[in-house]
């Protein structure tokens, strides 16, 4: 096993809970899904489709991030790039940007990491 693989196995990474109050059910419970931290591979996929993803994050890129990372509690992907992408692109921008912001919150800046 490579050193990089050994080091990655040492880390315990928990999924982040994402709550979308605007998608609440009839009882008022927000739609909840899970998202693991954004990885280098995720950024590679997003940058291939959306140049300068981190510097110029478009709504389309946010939708692709949601499709890429959103999972059920059991780890199943929730959205697909076909029909779901078209539906998500029709959603209000504030909802999409709020979800993407919660997903980006899993990224810890160098400055914040140094504080810990």
Please provide the spans of the model-predicted regions.
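Extended acidic low-complexity intrinsically disordered regions
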Residues: 1-14
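Generic cytosolic/nucleocytoplasmic N-terminal low-complexity/intrinsically disordered segments
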Residues: 4, 18-21, 48, 114-115
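Residue-level marker of intrinsically disordered, low-complexity segments enriched
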Residues: 11, 15-18, 36, 57
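Short acidic-hydrophobic surface loop/beta-edge motif
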Residues: 14-28
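Short, surface-exposed, charged amphipathic helix/loop patches that serve as local interaction elements
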Residues: 27-116
